[in-house]
């Protein structure tokens, strides 16, 4: 969920394409996606615990306890993996309104934390921007490609890109809420009665987000102080915020069905992702 300044470049690469080229690109992209998914599954290990025990809430900040009591029932099975499908709109520019419809499918594993997001943004009739956004074994990956054939950039590795992708994993964890439990590696620190900090460490990386809770105890927003935005070929650090709503029950847990993600720029808040969960399938620990 990066998407800054790709639209003009993508449309300049290809204004129209034949059906055969589109099909070839889709097939090639599907193969690349399968390879990433195989890498992700190879990192997967089973959760240490099979079920959530409410006793692990003892000592947590008050708003965090209220959250888990609101979304989980004692004995809830621990999520090991999830497949999430989304629909929505994506703004491809940080400086103007270039909202385009998208669909995506995301695979998430919680031990060790990782995901592969496979997105398809409709730039124009017959022209799709395919995007891989991933975090696998401490490596971050961002690859947008017109038709799955013409790569606009291919950034992967540790350091800045990996840190940003681990942030994404954590900010989206309310979709798979057992991943936010202390027993699953998240450390919570009190801020006030409506706010707490959540820290996740994976390998040499550590990320901390500020979480705000509503009157109902549910997570309403989360923010990182600085995340790298890819603007052209330059990384610019800005606060990064996600807002979540429309909580519904899935497999006994309450999870948000809609979300909006924004950069908090010096010029103001700039949303660039507005999405709805269209399908959500969990796999649980033994």
Predicted segments with their positions:
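Flexible, processing/modification-adjacent segments and terminal tails
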Residues: 143-202, 235
């Amino acid at each position: 969920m990066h998407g800054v300044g790709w639209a003009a470049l993508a449309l300049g690469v290809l204004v129209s394409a034949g059906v055969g080229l589109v099909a070839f690109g889709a097939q090639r992209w599907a193969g690349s996606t399968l390879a990433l998914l195989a890498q992700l599954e190879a990192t997967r290990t089973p959760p240490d615990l099979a079920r959530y025990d409410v006793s692990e809430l003892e000592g947590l900040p008050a708003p965090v306890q209220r959250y888990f009591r609101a979304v989980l029932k004692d004995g809830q099975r621990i999520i090991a993996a999830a497949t999430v499908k989304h629909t929505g709109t994506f703004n491809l520019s940080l400086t103007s309104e270039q909202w385009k419809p998208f669909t995506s499918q995301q695979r998430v594993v919680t031990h060790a934390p990782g995901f592969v997001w496979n997105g398809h943004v409709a730039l124009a009739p017959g022209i799709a921007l395919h995007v891989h956004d991933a975090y696998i074994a401490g490596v971050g990956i961002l690859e947008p490609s017109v038709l799955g054939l013409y790569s606009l950039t291919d950034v992967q590795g540790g350091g800045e890109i990996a840190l940003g992708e681990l942030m994404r994993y954590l900010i989206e964890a309310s979709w798979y809420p057992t991943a936010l439990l202390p027993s699953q590696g998240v450390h919570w620190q009190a801020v006030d009665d409506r706010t707490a900090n959540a820290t996740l460490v994976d390998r040499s990386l550590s990320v901390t987000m500020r979480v705000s809770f509503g009157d109902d105890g549910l997570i309403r927003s989360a923010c990182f102080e600085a995340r790298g935005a890819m603007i052209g070929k330059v990384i610019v650090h800005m606060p990064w915020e996600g807002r979540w709503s429309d909580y519904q029950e899935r497999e006994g847990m309450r999870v948000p069905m809609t979300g909006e993600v924004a950069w908090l720029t010096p010029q103001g808040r700039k949303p660039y992702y507005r999405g709805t969960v269209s399908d959500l399938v969990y796999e649980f620990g033994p």
